[in-house]
């Protein structure tokens, strides 16, 4: 096994290639998990406080406006610019701007509003009649979310998260350009800077395989959830 890991492919050791792939999966996995948490909160705020939503009033209108503007502003900033701009914040939170863990700060900040908009669209697929029926039965806001809104749109939300995961994969590759590690770092350091075209092609193939796997798994889970509704 050690002999295999120390052998080389296109000028780099297999161990280095596997390590960078693991770093990419680490960034995408944790970034998606944390981003989904914040993204879902933002999405629920947008859905519940929008005009005609479950929660109405002056405060809800202000909250909707603030969250809506925040989501639009962050989504309008290219990830590379966001990555560099919030370096002081990343250093403040993580103590460094280098490494896969430090890269989670800009990745989460980037993906949360992106997922919020995707999840908002999914949640809006729930028929207004279902929400009205829930309110007629005396369900409170939490019960509407837990027993009506989420179950009805879970399959669609899985597809939204699949799209978000693929976007996060691309962002994680860009994180490598500022020391985030992963496949992007491998492409820049050992591929582009050393004019190693075969290695660059290999990293592209790896990313394509990752995307196909994410899309396949997301689609399969979504179909299963829709079938059991």
List the predicted regions and their residue ranges.
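Hydrophobic alpha-helical elements at and bordering transmembrane segments
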Residues: 17, 21, 25, 66, ...
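Membrane-water interface segments at the C-terminal ends of transmembrane alpha-helices
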Residues: 18-124, 159-166, 206-214
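Short cytoplasmic-facing helical segments at TM-TM junctions of multi-pass membrane proteins
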Residues: 118-157, 187, 227
């Amino acid at each position: 096994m050690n002999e295999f890991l120390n052998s080389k492919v296109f000028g780099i050791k297999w161990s280095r290639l596997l390590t960078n792939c693991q770093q990419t999966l680490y960034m995408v996995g944790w970034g998606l998990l944390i981003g989904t948490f914040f993204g879902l909160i933002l999405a629920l705020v947008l859905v519940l406080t929008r005009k005609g939503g479950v929660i109405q009033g002056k405060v809800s209108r202000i909250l909707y406006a603030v969250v809506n503007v925040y989501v639009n502003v962050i989504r309008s900033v290219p990830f590379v610019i966001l990555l560099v701009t919030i370096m002081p914040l990343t250093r403040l939170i993580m103590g460094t701007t280098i490494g896969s863990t430090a890269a989670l700060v800009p990745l989460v900040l980037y993906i949360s509003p992106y997922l919020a908009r995707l999840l908002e669209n999914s949640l809006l697929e729930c028929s207004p009649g279902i929400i009205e029926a829930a309110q007629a039965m005396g369900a409170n806001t939490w019960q509407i979310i837990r027993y009506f809104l989420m179950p009805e749109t879970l399959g669609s939300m899985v597809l939204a998260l699949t799209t978000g995961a693929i976007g996060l994969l691309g962002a994680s590759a860009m994180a490598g350009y500022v020391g985030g590690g992963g496949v992007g770092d491998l492409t820049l350091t050992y591929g582009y800077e050393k004019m190693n075209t075969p290695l660059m092609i290999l990293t592209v193939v790896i990313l394509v395989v990752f995307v196909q796997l994410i899309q396949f798994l997301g689609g399969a889970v979504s179909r299963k959830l829709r079938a059991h509704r």
